[in-house]
Amino acid sequence: MIINVSCGNFEQSIRKIYIDEDQSVVGVTLGEGSYLVQGSLEFGGSQCHVLIGKYSSVAHGIKFIVGLNHDSSSASTYPFQEVFEGMLDKNAYLHPQCNHCQIIIGNDVWIGAYATIMGGVKIGNGAVIGAGAVVAKDVPPYAVVVGNPARVIKYRFDEATIEWLQKLCWWNWAPEKIKSCWPEMENMEAFKEKYRKIPTMKISEECQELQNVIKQFKEEGYQFYYFVPDLLSKEKIWQTVLSKFANVTDKKILFIDMPADIPSNVKMKFKQLINSYQQGQLVLNQSSEDYTSKCIIPLMDYIVTTKEADSSFIADIATSAKVKILYGMDEF
C-alpha cells in the first residue's frame, strides 16, 4: 500500500500521521519541531512505522519503503501465499522473517529531496542525507551520506565535537532555551565555548541499587530487554511484546519501565496483568523518569521500541550506549 505523508508545520508538539480513516493506526510519528514537506509511505502492513525525532528536516519527494521485502532465500521470490490465500487485498504483511518494519530517524537530521529510506534503517542524530540518496543501511550520527547505495562521504564535525553534541542533547532542551540560544548555534565555536561543560548526571540511591541488581543477573548470563509500554495507544504494541516473553525459559528478562504520565488506574490494571503471568521473566519498574532511563539503558542488551515518541528518546540513549535496538512488531 502507498499513502502520501506530509506534516509541514513546525509545532512544538508530537504529531502523528495515520494510515487509516479511523486514525487508529500510526504510520509516522514526528517529535517536537520536526517537519516533513511531502513524501510517500510504501508499506506492507499496519505494523510498519517511521519514527522521527526532534527538530529534523525532511524535504519533498521522500520515499519510506517498509515491510515489502520478498523472501529471497526460498525457491521463488513470488508471493504465492498471498495470491493463493487471497491476502493481496488485505494489505498483507510480507515475510516477517526478512523484514524490519520500523525506520528510526534521529534528532536534527536533514534529509534532502527525493531520498529513499528502507525499512530497518536507523539514522543517527545530526546526519545529512543527500538528495536522491538510497539509504539501505544505518547512518552514524553527524555523517553526510550520498548516492545509491548511500555511502558516507564525510562527517559534519570532528569526533570530539560529535561526542560532545551527543552528550549535550540540545534537542531535549525546553523550547524557550532553544529559542534564546539559536543565534549562538550559528557560530559553532561560540556555541561550544558556552556549553562545553555538560552537567554530570547524579544517580539516585534507588538507581544505584537497581543497577547493582541488573549487574548481578548479567553476571549469571541473563540478557535484558528494556521496554516502555505504549499503554495509551490503540495499537497496543505492548501486548505483542509481552507475548514474546510470556513463556520464555531461557535467560531473557523484559525490563518494563512504566511511563510517568500514565493514569493511576491504567497503571494498576497493567500491574495486575504483569502479576498474573505464571511463567516468563518480566520486571516492572514503576518510577520511570528521564534520569532513570539514562542510568539503566546502558546496562541493557536491547531496547524494544513502539510507535510512541518516547521510543525516540530511549533509542537515542541506546545508540550512544551501543545498545541494540529492536522494534516491538518485528520478529525477535
Regions found by a protein language model. Name each.
Residues 80-117, 149-217:
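C-terminal segments of enzyme domains that contribute to small-molecule binding surfaces
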Residues 26, 37-38, 112-120, 126, ...:
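Conserved beta-strand->loop/alpha-helix structural units within folded catalytic cores of enzymes
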Residues 139-151, 155-168, 267-272, 302-332:
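Catalytic binding pocket for nucleotide-activated donors in carbohydrate/polymer assembly enzymes
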Residues 128-130, 134, 208, 215:
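A generic "structured core" feature
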Residues 60, 218-288:
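Conserved catalytic-core segment of nucleotide-activated headgroup transferases in glycan assembly
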Residues 219, 297-298:
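A short, aliphatic-rich alpha-helical micro-motif
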Residues 6, 13-119:
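Flexible, glycine/small-residue-enriched loop-and-beta-strand segment within the central core
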Residues 280-296, 308-310:
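Conserved active-site histidine-acidic residue motif and adjacent donor-binding/catalytic loop
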